[in-house]
Amino acid sequence: YNHKGEKRKPKFDIKNFKKFKDKIIYLLINEKIPGMYKIDSLDNDDQKNGSHIMNALKRENFQRNCIVRGLNDATDEDWIIISDLDEIPNLKNSDLKNIKSPIVFFKQLMMYYKFNLILENYTWIGSKACRKKDLKSPQWLRNIKDRAYSWWRLDTLFSETK
């Protein structure tokens, strides 16, 4: 399904990645997503647009959380990296085996759709990682904040992602 919920043919073909076929765990998620908003023909444009946006977010979160289905062979000490397709952390200088912190934030270059469109001297937190034993859900890890918030920020007082 695409972000609009329209059925489409899968675009991934393992034959295009023969070199990595032993490293790729491909999951085709083809089930109904719970809690989707119904879009009624009597809804006004704002209601329809709002429902489309919320449904796209629900689809994305559901798909991301399905990642755990591919982690059956991972040990509790294995690191799980959650990122979008265009967020590729550079692990060349990272030795995850020696990191004691339960969560790792990867500073990444800000690129706009292509590798040659880089915002110079600007990094941002894209990918995040934790050990399998610490992973509550992939979406939980995605939502974790990379900074501490002041005590007076009531919106973060009871948050599990601060």
Language model: regions and residue ranges:
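Conserved catalytic core of nucleotide-sugar-dependent glycosyltransferases
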Residues: 56-60, 87-162
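Short beta-alpha junction loops
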Residues: 1-4, 110-111
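Active-site-proximal specificity loops/subdomain of glycosyltransferases
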Residues: 3-82, 91
